[in-house]
Amino acid sequence: MMRRYRRKNSSIPIIVEGRNDLASLRKLSFYGEIIVFNRGISITSFSDEISNKYREVIILTDFDNKGSFLKDRFYGYLTGMGVYVDLYLWNFIRKHVPIRTVEELPAEFEREVEKEIQM
């Protein structure tokens, strides 16, 4: 799953909430464009900027209430502006990975790798 999205990120940007989320994805070898939302502008203004620049985005906000709220708002605004929003990775992580934030992904990924090595 991660390998697939690393490749996808080479041509499609990922939207995250903050700089620490960006750093976490870099630790997981996501080297494509990652756009940080938390820049002091409204969701509608941010969505406008995104829709003027991209036809498709991947949303990877946190998995807590605030992150879910932002995901839903981005999805509503961006799809209404004609942008295809990929939520598959967000939904997959939410369902299968016991974390609440994007920042926790690298540590969880390391734990999974260690489990497989020990088997």
Swiss-Prot record:
<keyword id="KW-0460">Magnesium</keyword>
<dbReference type="GO" id="GO:0046872">
    <property type="term" value="F:metal ion binding"/>
</dbReference>
<dbReference type="InterPro" id="IPR006171">
    <property type="entry name" value="TOPRIM_dom"/>
</dbReference>
<comment type="similarity">
    <text>Belongs to the UPF0292 family.</text>
</comment>
<feature type="binding site">
    <location>
        <position position="64"/>
    </location>
    <ligand>
        <name>Mg(2+) 2</name>
    </ligand>
</feature>
<dbReference type="Pfam" id="PF01751">
    <property type="entry name" value="Toprim"/>
</dbReference>
<feature type="binding site">
    <location>
        <position position="17"/>
    </location>
    <ligand>
        <name>Mg(2+) 1</name>
    </ligand>
</feature>
<feature type="binding site">
    <location>
        <position position="62"/>
    </location>
    <ligand>
        <name>Mg(2+) 2</name>
    </ligand>
</feature>
<keyword id="KW-0479">Metal-binding</keyword>
<dbReference type="InterPro" id="IPR034141">
    <property type="entry name" value="TOPRIM_RNase_M5-like"/>
</dbReference>
<dbReference type="InterPro" id="IPR022972">
    <property type="entry name" value="UPF0292"/>
</dbReference>
<protein>
    <recommendedName>
        <fullName>UPF0292 protein TV1259</fullName>
    </recommendedName>
</protein>
<feature type="binding site">
    <location>
        <position position="62"/>
    </location>
    <ligand>
        <name>Mg(2+) 1</name>
    </ligand>
</feature>
<feature type="domain" description="Toprim">
    <location>
        <begin position="11"/>
        <end position="93"/>
    </location>
</feature>
